């Protein structure tokens, strides 16, 4: 039987683009591990993706995961859009390159053999874990220590 793990995520950006951060909580049998990191120049969507990626990459074996995010971009991207992006060679329906392709590929790889249930939660609506992740993300954004090397400014 697979281990049942809960993951909660959030990303934040002070300006978009601007300094950003992510926060994630990984919970298994009442034990929690938190993750957060700040980047000097990034976007909110990149930080939402990073939160999910880092938490999933921390799993050491195949798990049954419930991942809660307040990002429709992440949830819809991974459950609906990614299949066609991959078929089209990482291009959108308009034949444009997929934004944040470096992170979408990394998230796709991080899913591995996990069984994942994606749940959307309304942000800033009192969901305790989402609020904690938001606090982690905002604190990280205020003290960025990393460069988001994959971030590309709009032309």
Swiss-Prot record:
Sorted UniProt keywords: Cytoplasm, Endonuclease, Hydrolase, Magnesium, Metal-binding, Nuclease
Binding site for Mg(2+) 2: 10, 134
EC number: 3.1.26.4
Catalytic reactions of this protein: Endonucleolytic cleavage to 5'-phosphomonoester
InterPro entries (alphabetical): RNase_H (IPR050092), RNaseH-like_sf (IPR012337), RNaseH_domain (IPR002156), RNaseH_sf (IPR036397), RNaseHI (IPR022892)
GO molecular function ontology, one term from the record: magnesium ion binding
Any one biological process term the GO annotation gives: DNA replication, removal of RNA primer
SUPFAM superfamilies listed in its UniProt record: Ribonuclease H-like
Similarity annotation: Belongs to the RNase H family.
PANTHER family for the chain: RIBONUCLEASE H1 (PTHR10642:SF26)
Function: Endonuclease that specifically degrades the RNA of RNA-DNA hybrids.
Protein name: Ribonuclease H
């Amino acid at each position: 039987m697979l281990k049942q793990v809960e993951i909660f995520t959030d990303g934040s950006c002070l300006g978009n683009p601007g300094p950003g951060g992510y926060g994630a909580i990984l919970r298994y049998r009442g034990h929690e591990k938190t993750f957060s990191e700040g980047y000097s120049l990034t976007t909110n969507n990149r930080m939402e993706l990073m939160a999910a990626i880092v938490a999933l990459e921390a799993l050491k074996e195949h798990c049954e995961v419930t991942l809660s995010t307040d990002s429709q971009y992440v949830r819809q991207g991974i459950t609906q859009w990614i299949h066609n992006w991959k078929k089209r060679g990482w291009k959108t329906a308009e034949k444009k390159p997929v934004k944040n392709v470096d992170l979408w590929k990394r998230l796709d790889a991080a899913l591995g053999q996990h069984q994942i249930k994606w749940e959307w939660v309304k942000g800033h609506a009192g969901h305790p874990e989402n609020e904690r992740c938001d606090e982690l993300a905002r604190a990280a954004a205020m003290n960025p220590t990393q460069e988001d090397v994959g971030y590309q400014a709009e032309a």
